[in-house]
Amino acid sequence: FIGLLISAGKAIHDLIRRRH
């Protein structure tokens, strides 16, 4: 569960950083 949360958070963070 924690691994999935970290993966999702990392993916979201990457998406936000790419959008900027």
From Swiss-Prot:
The modification Histidine amide is found at H20. GO terms for biological process: defense response; defense response to Gram-negative bacterium; defense response to Gram-positive bacterium; hemolysis in another organism. Its main location: secreted. It comes from the Eukaryota. It is found in: Secreted. Gill. The keyword tRNA processing does not apply. One of its GO terms (cellular component) is extracellular region. Keywords: Amidation, Antibiotic, Antimicrobial, Cytolysis, Hemolysis, Secreted. The keyword Secreted applies. Belongs to the pleurocidin family. Has hemolytic activity against human red blood cells. Seems to disrupt the membranes by adopting an alpha helical conformation. May play a significant role in innate host defense. This is Chrysophsin-3.
